[in-house]
């Protein structure tokens, strides 16, 4: 829950992650479904849960990669997805699920822009981008994380989490005011 609204003297909690991600993803990819996409979801926390929900809703096939395998397994089983450890031992599986790579961990948050990629600031430091991948990092500050920098240098289409945040804000505005926000 990231938004609380009082309705009829009761507090109701909402999570706007899924809607924010959904709208920004459709805008990024220019498609309304993921039927032909094999998606790697990096991480298994709260943002990953919303992302998995959206990927399933859009009929995508996904694999959840996480450092703690039990968390990856739990989230993957909830949505009927594959799962694997987030490490170089899963490289072949990552390559199978690499048409869209969604980075949802906090790794890379707060590092300097254009900082050299290391395992401490890039969860996929072991992966060599081929240039065909679409790479989405939910982090919006810095604007270019080490993973996005490497992906861009390889010719991948990339996006950070700013539009997800923007669409979450639109939904929160609607929840608070009862008026749908119109982007001008």
Predicted features along the sequence, with ranges:
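Phosphate/diphosphate ligand-binding glycine-rich loop within oxidoreductases
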Residues: 1-31
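Glycine-rich adenosine-cofactor-binding loop
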Residues: 15, 25, 35-56, 66
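Adenosine-phosphate binding glycine-rich loop
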Residues: 36, 133-184
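Short, well-ordered alpha-helices that flank and scaffold nucleotide-derived cofactor binding pockets
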Residues: 23, 27, 53-57, 77, ...
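NAD(P)-binding Rossmann-fold cofactor-contacting core
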Residues: 58-79
């Amino acid at each position: 829950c990231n938004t609380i609204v009082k309705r009829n003297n009761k507090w109701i909690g909402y999570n706007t992650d899924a809607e924010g991600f959904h709208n920004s993803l459709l805008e990024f990819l220019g498609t309304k479904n993921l039927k032909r996409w094999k998606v790697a979801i990096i991480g298994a926390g709260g943002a990953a849960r919303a992302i998995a929900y959206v990927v399933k809703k859009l009929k995508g096939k996904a694999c959840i990669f996480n450092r703690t395998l039990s968390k990856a397994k739990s989230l993957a089983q909830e949505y009927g997805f594959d799962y694997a450890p987030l490490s170089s031992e899963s490289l072949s599986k990552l390559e199978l699920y690499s048409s869209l790579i969604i980075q949802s961990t906090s790794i890379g948050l707060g590092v300097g822009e254009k900082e050299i990629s290391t395992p401490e600031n890039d969860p996929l430091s072991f992966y060599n981008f081929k240039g065909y991948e679409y790479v989405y990092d939910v982090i919006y500050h810095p604007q270019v994380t080490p993973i996005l920098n490497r992906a861009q240098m390889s010719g991948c289409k990339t996006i950070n989490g700013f539009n997800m945040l923007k669409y979450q804000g639109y939904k929160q505005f609607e929840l608070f005011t009862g008026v749908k926000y119109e982007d001008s």
